[in-house]
């Protein structure tokens, strides 16, 4: 299902910052595809290169790290509107994996075109930096939950976050 950025239902959500028609057009121009994946599909492989950045259009996913003994630690959950794969695009390889928790739809943005767009529209680059900082604050909260909260407090914090 191909969706134009101009018709994206996520833009109507009050949680998202409005962007100019010019910025929206530029994003729509570089968007390459709309990918549909089933629950359990690997979106990003830990240690792998990823030439794309995605926006989660629908469904849920989670970011995780696999421990040496095979256990997985969920780092956080990704919901519609979240940027997926930014870390993997910034470094040579992803430091974590991302898996679809439910069936998902992703808008695919080629990394090189995104970087070029940031040079043309620094306001968008700032917005993405803000998203990265916001994500970091969630990770800080998750670390606090794991290290210092009781099981009941961890459950409550997760519900509030979602």
Which sequence ranges carry the predicted segments?
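Cyclic nucleotide-binding regulatory domains
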Residues: 15, 41-103
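Conserved active-site beta-strand element of glycosyltransferases/polysaccharide synthases
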Residues: 107
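A generic structural signal for short hydrophobic patches within well-formed alpha-helices
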Residues: 83, 114-115
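Polybasic "coupling" helices that flank or enter modular domains
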Residues: 119-162
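Residue-level recognition of specific faces of alpha-helices
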Residues: 26, 52, 74-77, 97, ...
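Cyclic nucleotide-binding regulatory module and flanking cytosolic helices
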Residues: 1-39, 83-84, 89-90, 120
């Amino acid at each position: 299902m191909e969706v134009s950025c101009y018709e994206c239902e996520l833009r109507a959500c009050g949680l998202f910052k409005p962007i100019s028609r010019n910025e929206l057009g530029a994003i729509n121009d570089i968007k390459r595809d709309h990918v549909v994946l089933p629950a359990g599909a690997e979106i990003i492989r830990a240690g792998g290169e990823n030439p794309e950045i995605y926006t989660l259009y629908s469904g849920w996913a989670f970011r995780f790290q696999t421990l040496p003994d095979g256990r997985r630690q969920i780092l956080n959950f990704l919901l519609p509107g979240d940027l997926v794969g930014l870390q993997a695009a910034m470094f040579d390889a992803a430091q974590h994996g991302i898996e679809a928790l439910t069936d998902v739809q992703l808008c695919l943005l080629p990394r090189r075109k995104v970087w070029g767009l940031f040079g043309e529209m620094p306001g968008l680059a700032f917005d993405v930096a803000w998203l990265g900082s916001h994500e970091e604050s969630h990770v800080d909260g998750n670390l606090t939950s794991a290290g210092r909260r009781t099981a009941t407090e961890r459950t409550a914090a997760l519900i509030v976050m979602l």
